[in-house]
Amino acid sequence: MTDSQQPGAATEQPKTEFALQKFYLKDVSLECPRSPQVFTGEWKPETNVQLNSQARPLDDQGLFEVELTLTVTTKSGGEVAYLVEVKQAGVFLARGFPKEQMGHLLAAYCPTTLFPFAREAVTDLVSKAGFPQMLLAPVNFDALYAQQLAQNHAGKAGEESAPAGASH
């Protein structure tokens, strides 16, 4: 028997597992406060898109729910034409990963997986409400995650550089 075949060998790596168990539409809302008047005027859309994601453990066996919230507000002529909010969620199995990798999986990889489904729901709702097709650009969740880490790191560095007991 070689060292790698012996039970409890020091070289054993923890087994990592990652899988999408289920994805689902958790909540959806569409508001068209100016219908039908909005369809009679000139269409000059100004769109604001907001993204938010959160993850929470479902058990101690590595199941997590990741929820991606996509809020799209479109104004025309300075007034809200429509507001769509979609909460796309998924149950993911993620275990055996180091803390740093787990953070990336839950905050970047999982939302990347969920985004196409949320985008499709928004597009479908906007179209069914009678508005021109809404095409949302892809989102780089890896870059957003890296930006958040950098902001958190900068915030901690700023706190550490201030002398204890100092007031401003």
From Swiss-Prot:
Subcellular location field: Cytoplasm
Example GO biological process: protein folding
Role this protein plays: One of the proteins required for the normal export of preproteins out of the cell cytoplasm. It is a molecular chaperone that binds to a subset of precursor proteins, maintaining them in a translocation-competent state. It also specifically binds to its receptor SecA.
Source taxonomy: Bacteria, Pseudomonadati, Pseudomonadota, Gammaproteobacteria, Chromatiales
The encoding gene: secB
Protein name: Protein-export protein SecB
Gene3D superfamilies: SecB-like (3.10.420.10)
Flavoprotein found in the keyword field: no
Subunit organization: Homotetramer, a dimer of dimers. One homotetramer interacts with 1 SecA dimer.
Keyword Protein transport in annotation: yes
